């Protein structure tokens, strides 16, 4: 996987800590243990909560080959793992992501439609099998 791309500004401290620790791609981040995340959080300004969020995003990026913004949308909508996505329905994914986008007040059309949700769920279920 490529180096971190499209990370929101809210993760800038975590990005700096990860890069200083030599972790510059999604695969390495996905594979970090809780202890390693805690060590990173203690070493600088990165928050444990944001590091865990980034690890969840990394899991979706690596496992499902999703773009980071789509993985972040799923994670923030409460679908943080490929197993959770595999257990969901397309309607539920559209509902949860749409609710999040409306609460953020982006004013743009929904990113996730039934076709997209179905595609993501199929990938997640293939991973599970």
State where each predicted segment sits:
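C-terminal extensions
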Residues: 1-129
